[in-house]
Amino acid sequence: MKKNQFLKESDVTAESVFFMKRRQVLKALGISAAALSLPHAAHADLLSWFKGNDRPPAPAGKALEFSKPAAWQNNLPLTPADKVSGYNNFYEFGLDKADPAANAGSLKTDPWTLKISGEVAKPLTLDHDDLTRRFPLEERIYRMRCVEAWSMVVPWIGFPLHKLLALAEPTSNAKYVAFETIYAPEQMPGQQDRFIGGGLKYPYVEGLRLDEAMHPLTLMTVGVYGKALPPQNGAPVRLIVPWKYGFKGIKSIVSIKLTRERPPTTWNLAAPDEYGFYANVNPHVDHPRWSQATERFIGSGGILNVQRQPTLLFNGYAEQVASLYRGLDLRENF
């Protein structure tokens, strides 16, 4: 696996600069109440920088045993741990970037059951311990690109999804893989209240083509920064598909089902003209309400000196994955 393009050391966010009280920052910048009345997604390019509590906690899960294969270690400077665990989209716990860190402690992740079913010869059920012990874990340093045009670099820990699927033995009828998040409204306030949860239909669902799911880059992720995932990052297990926008990285997965037909996906159901099934990172295909040509790396300059950088096709993984989409119109199949 060849190394990808890398970012400058100056783009790494210092531990002390990112989390500031929203009211203080908005007042300092003279942002009016009218700006705050814009639709949530319409000001993703602006307000997502000003949300949050003072210092959401860094990951505090148990330490994991894992290897660091050279193929997945690179020159990408890491986004600090407190930013990775404190600046999240997980609408089941609220719309604000700091809400998941503040509210996700209510999620019970042990015991846990993950079922693999559908078009497979050998259906499987994994428990909480299986997720960290059944497969050799490895650390992979990946870019993470949100559809809101901000990005991070994260040292995820997990195992390739294809290893799990191989155990289940997909049949010749399997063409797609459908994923589902836990439905637990008593633990997830966004599932209980449509206002808190952004009006989405829950449980959250996602999907991939089978060849995408079997690609070596696609990771079943159980840890970050050497420890088990914290709830706000999708504990105990989430999906990471680094060449796709972050909303494809479904969190807190309880079901994986192989299917003949393309499965529904949450954001495509909510706004099909804005969020496609493929969701490949593409600087040439804009979101209807903002450009995808550049992105804001969570960096050391602070919110008053935000440095934008060009968005890379397939998030910098084109050499590895472009062949999956040969002959496919990426503008039409966004």
Swiss-Prot record:
GO terms for cellular component: periplasmic space. GO terms for biological process: protein repair. GO terms for molecular function: metal ion binding; molybdopterin cofactor binding; oxidoreductase activity, acting on a sulfur group of donors, quinone or similar compound as acceptor. It comes from the Bacteria. Its EC number is 1.8.5.-. It holds the Pfam family Oxidored_molyb. Its cofactor is Mo-molybdopterin. Residues 1-44 form the signal peptide. Heterodimer of a catalytic subunit (MsrP) and a heme-binding subunit (MsrQ). Part of the MsrPQ system that repairs oxidized periplasmic proteins containing methionine sulfoxide residues (Met-O), using respiratory chain electrons. Thus protects these proteins from oxidative-stress damage caused by reactive species of oxygen and chlorine generated by the host defense mechanisms. MsrPQ is essential for the maintenance of envelope integrity under bleach stress, rescuing a wide series of structurally unrelated periplasmic proteins from methionine oxidation, including the primary periplasmic chaperone SurA and the lipoprotein Pal. This is Protein-methionine-sulfoxide reductase catalytic subunit MsrP. It comes from Escherichia coli O1:K1 / APEC.
